C-alpha cells in the first residue's frame, strides 16, 4: 500500500508569465511525483476559485497563499493516507476546504495535490498514468483539435471568436494526425504572409491576424488546408470555440462582429456557417447562463454539429446534469482546474458519456509543461483533445506525450478519427 509521506509545493510560472502552483509528493516506497496547475484567460463564472494573493506582487496574481494552503493545511491532512485511494483523498480535500467553490484553500492548491497523488500512485504501481486511470481497455488516441488561429481573449485583435481549430479526422494514426495538423499550421503562416497579414502568435500558439471576421478566418484556414495538400472536410475539418460569454451582456445581448444580436440571431449565424463550411464542433456558442438559448440552439442544429459546453458546464457534474435534463448542448469540455479534483473530473466525464454526450479534453491558455491531460484523454476515451497549436513547448508537450502513448500501445492503439464525431463528420464528406 503506497502511503503518502511528504507533500511540498512551490510557486512557478505558467506560459503567460503568471504564477501557478506546482505540487511534489513522495510515498513511503520511494515514489516521487510532481504536478503543475494550469490557469485560464476566459474563465467561467461558475468555475472553482483560484486562490490568488492580491497586492502588488505579480500584479496581484501571486499564489503564495495557495502554496501555503498546501503546506499548512493539505499536507498534514493527507500524509499517512494511501495514494491509491484517489476518491477518498479527493473527498478529504473537499471536506477540508468546506466551501462549494473551493475558495478557502483554492482550487489551484487542491488540484495540484489531487493530480500529484494520481501520478504518484501510477508510478508506484509501475503503470503509465493513462493505464492506471483508464484500466486495460484504454486505447483510443484523441483527435487533436488544433487552435491555429487565435482571437477573442487569446489575442489582441478585432476577431470575436476565440479559437479557430483544425481537426485531422482523416488521418490513420495520431502520429500522422499531428503531422497533418503541423503542416496545415505552417501552410497557414504562408497564406497569411502572402496576404500581408500578421503571423504573430496568440496565447495558445495560433496565429493572431486582425481579419474581418469569422468567415474571413475560416476562408484563410480552408485555403491553408488545401494548400497543404489535404481535402477540406474529409482529411481535415474545422471547429470553433466562440467563448460567447466574453461578448454577452445581460439585458443587451451578444455584441458580435459590430452588431448586437439575440440568441436566435446567433443561432441563425451558426446555421449559415454550417451551410458554408465543414464544421464538426462549436464550443460555447452562447453565454454560460443563457440556458433557454442553449436549449433552442441544440434543438435547431444539435443534429448537425457538436455543441460543446465549456463555461456552460465548467466540468461540474451538477451543472452538466442540469444541462442534460434541459437538453442543452451535446458535448462536455473537460478542464480539470474548472472543478478542482481528479475525482470530480472523472465523475463529470462518466456522466457525460453515460448520457450520450461527447467529451473533449482541454488545456487552459495559461499552461505548463505538465502532460496529465494527454494521459487523461486516453484514459477516459474522450476521442478529442484541445491543447493549442502545434507550437510553443507547453502545448507540444501534450502532443508529444500522446505520441509516446501511441507507441506504448503499439498495435492496440486506435486513432479516433472521424468516429470522434459520429453524427457530424459524415455531413462533411
UniProtKB/Swiss-Prot annotation:
It catalyses: (2R)-2-phosphoglycerate = phosphoenolpyruvate + H2O. Binds a second Mg(2+) ion via substrate during catalysis. The keyword S-adenosyl-L-methionine does not apply. It is found in: Cytoplasm; Secreted; Cell surface. Keywords: Cytoplasm, Glycolysis, Lyase, Magnesium, Metal-binding, Secreted. It comes from the Bacteria. Pathway: Carbohydrate degradation; glycolysis; pyruvate from D-glyceraldehyde 3-phosphate: step 4/5. The keyword rRNA processing does not apply. GO terms for biological process: glycolytic process. Transmembrane segments: none annotated. Mg(2+) binds at residues 241, 283, 310. GO terms for molecular function: magnesium ion binding; phosphopyruvate hydratase activity. (2R)-2-phosphoglycerate binds at residues 162, 335, 364-365, 386. One of its GO terms (cellular component) is extracellular region. Its EC number is 4.2.1.11. SMART domains: Enolase_C (SM01192), Enolase_N (SM01193). SUPFAM superfamilies: Enolase C-terminal domain-like, Enolase N-terminal domain-like. Gene3D superfamilies: Enolase-like C-terminal domain, Enolase-like, N-terminal domain. InterPro entries: Enolase, Enolase-like_C_sf, Enolase-like_N, Enolase_C, Enolase_CS, Enolase_N. Catalyzes the reversible conversion of 2-phosphoglycerate (2-PG) into phosphoenolpyruvate (PEP). It is essential for the degradation of carbohydrates via glycolysis. Belongs to the enolase family. This is Enolase.
